[in-house]
Amino acid sequence: MTDQTSDVHMVRGHRPPKAEFMVYFTIIFIAALPLAFIASFLAMVRQGDLKTKGPIARAWSQARIITPMIFSA
């Protein structure tokens, strides 16, 4: 009996083109900025300190979460 698992070729996952990924990331980041400013302002008002995540960090996080979802669909 032959061992059919010894010569298995691993198929590499399809990686999205870098330029296209960055275009989508930029669009999502810009779209998330206004909502991130509002969320940061409300968090600052409620908590009363500036230790909360800033608006740019919030928008960046959202873009990092959403953009790969688009390419994996």
Curated annotation (Swiss-Prot):
One BP annotation, GO? photosynthesis
Q: Which domain of life is it from?
A: Bacteria
Record's InterPro entries?
PufQ_cyt-su (IPR008800)
* Keyword Acetylation applies: no
UniProt keywords, alphabetically: Bacteriochlorophyll biosynthesis, Chlorophyll biosynthesis, Photosynthesis
Family, per entry = Belongs to the PufQ family.
Q: Give the protein's biological function.
A: Required for bacteriochlorophyll biosynthesis. Directly involved in the assembly of both the B875 and B800-850 pigment-protein complexes.
What this protein is called in its record is Protein PufQ
**What is the source species?**
Rhodovulum sulfidophilum (Rhodobacter sulfidophilus)
Question: What gene codes for this chain?
Answer: pufQ
